[in-house]
C-alpha cells in the first residue's frame, strides 16, 4: 500500500513532475522545490536524533520563511504532529498554547525562546545548522487519516481552538481550490497577505505551490499593502490573496502599476462587499475578482468564484468534493433565495479540536459554519452575515453588514462596523464605527449626509443612532472583524449621539412639580405689575425657553450646528424626520423637560412650533389638551381657541387662594353639564369629581377626546 505521508507524497510528486529545479519560494533567496524537500528530509532526521518519534507534538512559533515550510514538512515526515502558532501573540498566549499542546519541542526564534520551558525549546537557526550536517531521512509510513498538523481558529467566537487536520486533507482542498477554481499551474506565483500559521495563508503559500509546482512570495514581516506593492513589482506574482480589509487599503495607498503581473485576485476571511469588489475591478484593470468562503475547520476554501466563472457580490458556488446546504431555523433545508445557516460536508473537515471535547462536525458529518447565506436556483451563494453578528434592536433582527455596505459607499469612509450597544436605560441602539479614507475627513457635514442617506434607504430601526470615527477597527490577526470588542467600548470620537431615555408608559403627559402653584410670586397689586401681567410675562418667557429646547434637540438630530437654522413651522417629515426619529425626539424632550410624553405626540402636533406649544402648556400645569394642534372648527369658537382659554383659566386657578377654589370648581361643574348635555354617564362623573384636581383630570379625559 502506498505511503500516505503527506511530506513524502509532495516530494515524490515534485520529483516525478520535474519540479525539483523550479522556484518554490521567493524570499531573501530563491529556494527551489528540490531544496525544500531535501531540507525537510534532513530536518526530519534532526528531529529523530533529538528523540522525537511518531505521535509526538512540536509547536512551531515562527514568522513566515522557507525554514518554517521545511520544519513543517520535517514534522510530517517523521509522523510528528505540528502546531502552528502566531509568533506575534502575547507571552501569556504562548504559555497557554504550550500548556495546551504539551509539545516535546518548541521551535522558535531567539527573541521568543525565553517564553517557553528551556529544556523543550530550540531555535530554528540551530536546527537548520544541524540539518546541514546530516543525511536526509526517510518518511514514516502513515495512513491518510493520521494526524498531521493543527492551525488555530481566528477567535471571533471565543478563545482560538486548534483544529486538527490529517495527512490527506490538504490534497482535498488543493484539488478543490487550486485545480477547479484557480487553475493553478507551475507557471503561477502567489502572494498572500495572510500568514502561514493561519489556514488561509498555509494553503495559499505552502500547500498550493508545493502541490502544483508553482511558487509563492514569502515575507518574514507582515505583508502590508505597501509591502505587497513592492513585492509584486519585484517578483511579478500572478495571484494575489488577501482579505477585504487588506484590499481596501491597497486601493487607498498603492498604485495599480505595481500589480500589472496579476491574472486574478482572491479574497476570503470576510465577505467582499459589492462596492469594494467593483473598486477592485477598476483598480486591477478588470481581472477576475474571486470571493469565496472557507474555514479553519475545513482547512481552506470550499465555496468560491472561479477564474472562468465568477459573479461580483457572491461567494461563488460550491467546489467539489464538498457539499453544502442552507439550514432554516426549523432545521429543514431552505429553498432558493431563502436565508439560513451554511453547513458544509466533505472529506477534509477537521477531525476535532486539540484537547477539547467539542467536535466541529454535527450530525452525519455536517459542519455548521455559523455563516448566514442564501443560494439561488443556480447554486450561487450570497453571504449575509455571521450568525452571531445579527443585532437585535427593539426585538427586531438587524443585519449590520447591510448598513455597513451603504456606509462605505461614501468615498470618505474606508471601513465601517455597526454594532448594538446598550444605553444606560437598558435599551439597545445601533452604533457605527468609521475609519476615514486616507486624506479624507469625516466631519459633521459628511456625517449628516451619511445619516440622511441611510434614512432614505433603510428602515429607521436599522439606522445607527450613534457614530464615532476611530483610527482602526479591532480585527483578529488574519483580518476578521471582532464585533464583540466594539460592543464593549464607547466611541472615542463621537460625531453625534441620540441618547434614549426610558420609554414612556403610554399615559398622558404629566408635569413634575413645575406648575405655577409651586412658584413664589413676589409683589402684590400695590404699584407693581398686576398678577395677570406677571403671568403673561411668565408665559412668554416659558414659551421662548421651550421653543429653544425643541430647536436645540431637533438640530442635534439633524446635524445642524445652529438650532435656529431649523425651520420651526415646517412639518417634521419635511425636515427629514421619519417616525423613528420623531419618537426619539420626543424621548429626548421628555428627558429635558421631566415630562412623560406619549410617543406619538410629535406626529400629533406636526412641527417644532406645534410641539413647543404643547410642551409649554404641559410645563405650565395644563392637562386639557387636544389630539391636534390645528383648529377643528373655524373661527374663535374652534376647539383650539377653547383650549387656549382653558390654559389661561388654569394659570389663574393655580394662584388663587384655597378658599376660592371650591367656587371655581362649582362653575366648572356647571360648564361641563352644559357641554355634555343630557349624557347621564358624564353627569355621574361630574358628581363624583369633588376637587379641582379631579375636575382638571375630567377635562383632560373628556374634552381631550
Swiss-Prot record:
Signal sequence region: none
O-(pantetheine 4'-phosphoryl)serine carried by residues: 579
Gene3D superfamilies found in the cross-reference section: 3.30.300.30, ACP-like, N-terminal domain of ligase-like
A Pfam family per the record: AMP-binding
Keywords assigned: Fatty acid metabolism, Ligase, Lipid metabolism, Phosphopantetheine, Phosphoprotein
InterPro entries for the chain: ACP-like_sf, AMP-bd_C, AMP-bd_C_sf, AMP-dep_synth/lig_dom, ANL_N_sf, PKS_PP-bd, PP-bd_ACP
Catalysed reaction equations from the record: holo-[4-hydroxyphenylalkanoate synthase] + 4-hydroxybenzoate + ATP = 4-hydroxyphenyl-[4-hydroxyphenylalkanoate synthase] + AMP + diphosphate; 4-hydroxybenzoate + ATP + H(+) = 4-hydroxybenzoyl-5'-AMP + diphosphate
Top-level taxon of origin: Bacteria
GO biological process: one example: phenolic phthiocerol biosynthetic process
Ranges for domain Carrier: 541-619
Annotated EC: 6.2.1.50
Function (record text): Catalyzes the adenylation of p-hydroxybenzoic acid (pHBA) to form p-hydroxybenzoic acid-AMP (pHBA-AMP), which is converted directly to p-hydroxybenzoyl-S-FadD22 (pHBA-S-FAdD22) thioester intermediate in a CoA-independent manner by attack of the phosphopantetheine thiol of FadD22. Usually, this intermediate primes the biosynthesis of the phenolphthiocerol (PPOL) by presenting the pHBA starter unit for elongation by Pks15/1, but M.tuberculosis lacks Pks15/1 due to a natural frameshift and thus is unable to produce PPOL.
UniProt-recorded name of the protein: p-hydroxybenzoic acid--AMP ligase FadD22
UniProt organism field: Mycobacterium tuberculosis (strain ATCC 25618 / H37Rv)
Organism ancestry: Bacteria, Bacillati, Actinomycetota, Actinomycetes, Mycobacteriales
